[in-house]
A protein has these predicted regions:
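Helix-coil boundary and interhelical linker segments in multi-pass alpha-helical membrane proteins
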Residues: 1-4, 54-65, 111-124, 172-179
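Membrane-interface interhelical linkers
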Residues: 1-13, 19-33, 37-69, 82-92, ...
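Hydrophobic core positions of alpha-helical segments in small-molecule transporters
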Residues: 10, 37-38, 100-103, 122-126, ...
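Hydrophobic/small/kink-forming positions within alpha-helical transmembrane segments
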Residues: 16, 20, 47, 75-79, ...
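Hydrophobic/aromatic residues within transmembrane alpha-helices
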Residues: 25, 34, 38, 88, ...
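A helix-boundary/kink motif common to multi-pass secondary transporters
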Residues: 30-31, 93-94, 120, 178-179
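Alpha-helical transmembrane segments of compact multi-pass small-molecule transporters, enriched
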Residues: 40-45, 100-114, 129, 188-193
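Hydrophobic transmembrane alpha-helices of multi-pass small-molecule transport proteins
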Residues: 46, 111-116, 122-141
Length: 225
């Protein structure tokens, strides 16, 4: 009867735990290493899931339309959004960054209202205002002065914006397509972007060195699950 509510609670708990583990891993092996390693883990785990459910490791039945929008969603959400988010973990910590990320539904609804002609009820608008007020109260003091580094806060909001836009792009491309296959396509494009970035910055030696830190690799592996 309460399957939806229970599922939402489990997702929230998993999201919080993964943020804590990713913060720990980022402080040990760097945010770039964490990003690419956890995307590889996610790609493999989803591939195994597809192998069990659809007898194929990688989705080959997506249309060009779906590839375009899901790929773009992966670039914006899983590359740019997570690039900012994981960097913010190292500056303001995962707890504050996760709090900022709670604004993703608000940003998504607002963008949908302005650009996709989606309708927001009075109840939804009140919920948005309450959510934003809660975030401001949590990160500001009594004089409304921000208590956390501005750079970290901006990076966290950049991550939230990337996630929100990524969700909208994903919604446009997914239609009635299999969600697991769609997620793997998004991850593939995000992974490709990180590979290009790490290659351009010549950071592969640092990624290779990250595997020597067992504690860091353990943390990013647990967070990926």
């Amino acid at each position: 009867m309460f399957f939806g509510e229970i599922a939402a609670l489990v997702v929230a708990i998993c999201w919080t735990l993964s943020a804590l583990f990713f913060e720990k891993a980022g402080r040990k092996i760097g945010s770039l290493s964490v990003n690419i390693i956890r995307l590889v883990w996610a790609f493999v785990l989803l591939g195994i899931t597809l192998l069990i459910t659809k007898q194929t490791f990688f989705p080959t039945d997506a249309t060009g339309y779906q590839w375009f929008w899901l790929g773009l969603s992966g670039v914006v959400g899983l590359f740019l959004g997570d690039l900012f988010l994981f960097k913010s973990y190292l500056i303001i910590g995962s707890r504050t960054a996760t709090l900022v990320m709670s604004s993703v539904p608000v940003i998504t609804a607002t963008i949908g209202w302005f650009f996709l002609d989606e309708i927001l009820s009075l109840k939804s608008i009140i919920a948005i205002l309450v959510s934003l007020s809660g975030i401001v109260i949590a990160i500001a003091d009594r004089r409304l002065k921000i208590r956390v580094p501005a750079k970290g806060l901006l990076l966290a909001f950049g991550g939230a914006m990337g996630q929100a836009i990524g969700l909208i792009l994903s919604k446009k491309g997914i239609g009635d397509y299999d969600p697991i296959s769609a997620t793997q396509i998004r991850i593939l494009f995000g992974l490709i972007c990180f590979i290009i970035m790490i290659t351009a910055l010549r950071r592969w030696p640092k990624v290779k060195e990250a595997f020597k830190d067992r504690s860091g690799i353990r943390a990013v592996s647990i967070g990926s699950f």
